[in-house]
């Protein structure tokens, strides 16, 4: 029997007849306390530790460092389980204080079971200390807080559940028009310079997930360096008002384009396995893969080395199957073991098709799998409209699943969103006419539609990720901003129609613009309201604007009669 082995590093030291030993297990990762706040490469080597040990900016050849530090002491707190209790795989038997943001639950590895013959008392232990001993059919087995898991096999769950909670990202265009769910699959395809990485980073910083795994897979080294510089300085505000570092809930898997191809192919699996580990504790985890195109290119390169038959564009024939097997590890699940708990993994994959061509094999295979498509547009990016999500081609198949959430949050929201979509679609239809005959030849209602669409485009969908007031937009602010813009559209159309049927002065779009300029300015300025002032203050301001719009138009109609 022959085995083909791709060597991970320089092969200069090897020669014929050198012995090759099997590790007797597939590529596995170490899972335990200490993962959060760490940065690994594609095969889970800790890059910080390597940098300190080697004192070099590059990873030296042949360096081998354990993924998790085995000597750090962790505060171990067992649950109510005691000696003589029976426990099975997935049961949580202790908690470990990981950091002020995350409580780390220690579970029995899947596939193990038995009667507890020893459980460590509360205290400080490292990852080599035995904290649990089980007896099953007369055989005793010891467990530490550390477990290993092969990256290519999904971790088992009790059952899959239907997702019904939205993934709130803080980006208005995504939350309002194309929402995803906790446990969803999203794709962000876009050409270079469209802002894929900024959207991925915004998701990592501000989304309502409890843990984030960010996989930089084959992207430029300076992008990962930027993430490494930014994330430790970023803070998130907790419901009780505390400021905590985003790094405390984040794990980075950095695999830049100058690292070996084999690790690039493995890095996505490493990331998803770490995400599943936190999901099994009952957390909602989101995983960003930036970018799956580079991962597919690594597959293509390895497939070429193995002399497999190439398919479309040189990619292997099993590309779609590999992508599907990765994306299907997302989802909301009922976790194994007791206590009863639900967790979820949301996957957001950035795709960078060459030249922004969406018919590329990786993009088309991804779009047939994922449920949410946030399509980035080069033209919008060139107009400096960010996030450059094209609202005409993007879609979300989760709108139906989230209806019950929206009904509870705000019963009017679904109608408002439908109207906003209609306005944006109508604007696209009118643009051709405007280019032929100019704006003045349009009907008054069409002029109002164009103005509303401009408000939606420039002051609602566009969002500046580098300002304190707009870097994160809470959902209540998104809803109220959209409500006021659509309210303006409805009132303006009503005013024009009513005045047309009377003998008084006609109300035209230019009259509205001239007479209600101050209200118009306030509509444009809604985005400058800072969420730091608190929900009550902001909703009060938005309600006042809503009432002022109603009053302003009523007065205008009275004068026209």
From Swiss-Prot:
Q: Which organism is it from?
A: Zea mays
Quaternary structure? Answer: V-ATPase is a heteromultimeric enzyme composed of a peripheral catalytic V1 complex (main components: subunits A, B, C, D, E, and F) attached to an integral membrane V0 proton pore complex (main component: the proteolipid protein).
Tissue specificity, per the record, is: High expression in the mesocotyl tip of etiolated seedlings compared to the base.
Q: Which Pfam families match?
A: ATP-synt_ab, ATP-synt_ab_Xtn, ATP-synt_VA_C
Gene3D superfamilies according to UniProt:
2.30.30.650, 2.40.50.100, Bovine Mitochondrial F1-atpase, Atp Synthase Beta Chain, Chain D, domain 3, P-loop containing nucleotide triphosphate hydrolases
Catalytic reactions on record? ATP + H2O + 4 H(+)(in) = ADP + phosphate + 5 H(+)(out)
Which family does the entry's similarity section mention? Belongs to the ATPase alpha/beta chains family.
Query: Which GO BP terms, alphabetically?
Result: ATP metabolic process; proton transmembrane transport
* EC annotation from Swiss-Prot or TrEMBL: 7.1.2.2
Q: Which domain of life is it from?
A: Eukaryota
The record's section on PANTHER family has:
V-TYPE PROTON ATPASE CATALYTIC SUBUNIT A
Query: Which lineage do the record's taxonomy fields give for this organism?
Result: Eukaryota, Viridiplantae, Streptophyta, Embryophyta, Tracheophyta
InterPro entries linked: ATP-synt_VA_C (IPR055190), ATP-synth_a_Xtn (IPR031686), ATPase_a/bsu_AS (IPR020003), ATPase_F1/V1/A1_a/bsu_nucl-bd (IPR000194), ATPase_F1/V1_b/a_C (IPR024034), ATPase_V1-cplx_asu (IPR005725), P-loop_NTPase (IPR027417), V-ATPase_asu (IPR022878)
Q: Name one GO molecular function term.
A: proton-transporting ATPase activity, rotational mechanism
Where ATP is bound, by residue?
190-197
Function as written in the Swiss-Prot or TrEMBL entry: Catalytic subunit of the peripheral V1 complex of vacuolar ATPase. V-ATPase vacuolar ATPase is responsible for acidifying a variety of intracellular compartments in eukaryotic cells.
The identity of this protein, by name, is V-type proton ATPase catalytic subunit A
* GO CC aspect terms: plant-type vacuole; proton-transporting V-type ATPase, V1 domain
Q: Which UniProt keywords apply?
A: ATP-binding, Hydrogen ion transport, Ion transport, Nucleotide-binding, Translocase, Transport
Q: What class of enzyme is it?
A: translocase
